A protein has these predicted regions:
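Active-site anion-handling motifs in enzyme catalytic cores
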Residues: 3-372, 376-383, 387
Length: 388
């Protein structure tokens, strides 16, 4: 889908210029409501959102007259590696950061090279960096960038969605149909609601108010459920914050994948196979309370966000010393050229391998045809011999 450039909208245009302007990281075109749950978690700490900043184009963001925009940077980064580092006008609070290779590059060095030089310096100015998972922390530490394990900002979601429900219900979010049916058969006389975080529809930034209402509706559903079974981090972690008993399912029995590292320990966990075999340590009739381990992370996250907002409003956050625009462009151009060279090298190697395989196939086909002809000749001779 071709992206049409759009002016960054203001959520709450102010009649007077405030002492500080605040930005909110969002994904402009969205098909996973989990991204909006992350944005909602950051929004609760801001006096207002003066700017919505497109996560995938954070480098090209421009504020009015270049004014500083104080922004909590909790998000999944490097899905669009060409768009790092953030624009100079963004004054960041780096926490709940997740860096991942995504699908843009196939080689490890092509991914992490954007954390060298200016890309890494953008983080070093604000050390230590709050990392959502241990794998992200290890990646940054390998680049000599100091970190701390912050967990996800959704751990701070407020428990404000409690309401009376006519009949008890449970939720199964983004799980296999077999899991949903097993839960229905084993949870007693409780309605089981199926939830999809990715429903196939794409919502644009012009639907922001509608997207926020959808997040609040989803969180209301989760907070009032008897329990939740899910494969989604951005279901499981909000349920921790909301106090709803939750079981996180993942195919990796070690729970050591990039996204789960350090976070799975906060949750009740099982594989789908363990659940279906009745081996999960999670009673659907009397669901266990969530582990309290996340509370220390929640407290520090709240402290960091409030201190950041207070300092921004007080004007005590100094302007950083930044490279010139020319230096940034030259650095990014060099990184892009290097990445392109690597990709072209990979393409050339793939083409050579394809040529080799094609030649092997042609030789195999030729050998097969020769064998078939020989078999035909032998069969014909056998037939002649029988007639004699």
């Amino acid at each position: 889908r071709e992206r049409v450039p759009r002016r960054t909208p203001s959520v709450s245009p102010a009649a007077e210029t405030p002492a500080a302007r605040f930005g909110l990281i969002v994904k402009y075109d969205l098909d996973n409501i989990g991204d909006d749950v992350q944005a909602y978690a950051a929004l609760q700490f801001l006096p207002r959102a003066d700017y919505l900043i497109d996560r995938d184009h954070v480098d090209s963001f421009r504020s009015r007259d270049g004014e500083p925009v104080y922004t909590i940077m909790n998000a999944w980064w490097f899905d669009c590696k060409w768009n790092w580092p953030p624009a100079d006008c963004i004054r960041p609070l780096y926490l709940s950061m997740h860096f991942s290779k995504g699908t843009t590059f196939a080689e490890e060095d092509a991914d992490t090279t954007f954390l060298n030089g200016i890309g890494g310096d953008a983080l070093r100015r604000y050390e230590p960096i709050g990392c959502r998972d241990q794998k992200t922390a290890a990646l940054l530490e390998s680049k000599d960038i100091r970190t701390w394990f912050s967990g996800c900002l959704t751990l701070t979601l407020p428990r404000k969605f409690r309401c009376n429900v006519a009949e008890p219900y449970a939720c199964v979010s983004d799980a296999y149909p077999a899991v949903t049916e097993w839960v229905r058969r084993n949870c007693g006389h409780v309605e089981v609601r199926e939830i999809r975080h990715v429903d196939g529809s794409v919502r644009g930034i012009e639907q922001w108010d509608e997207r926020i209402r959808a997040v609040e509706d989803l969180l209301t559903t989760y907070q009032n459920a008897k329990f939740v079974v899910t494969t989604r981090l951005h279901c499981a972690l909000p349920c921790l914050a909301l106090g709803t008993p939750v079981l996180l399912l993942t195919e990796d029995s070690s729970f050591d994948s990039t996204r789960f590292s350090g976070l799975a320990a906060l949750l009740h966990t099982a594989t789908p196979q363990q659940l279906l075999a009745g081996e999960a340590a999670f009673d659907l009739i009397s669901p266990p309370a969530n582990k309290p381990d996340y509370l220390a992370l929640r407290e520090r996250l709240e402290q960091e966000c409030r201190a950041f907002v207070d300092a921004a409003q007080a004007g005590t956050i100094p302007a950083p010393s930044l490279p010139s625009e020319e230096e940034r462009r030259a650095w990014k151009l060099q990184k892009c050229e290097n990445a392109l060279d690597r990709l072209l090298g990979t393409l050339r190697r793939t083409q050579l391998e394809n040529t080799r395989l094609k030649n092997d196939l042609e030789k195999t086909t030729c050998d097969w045809n020769s064998l078939a002809a020989e078999n035909t000749r032998i069969w014909a001779e056998l037939q002649k011999a029988r007639k004699r």
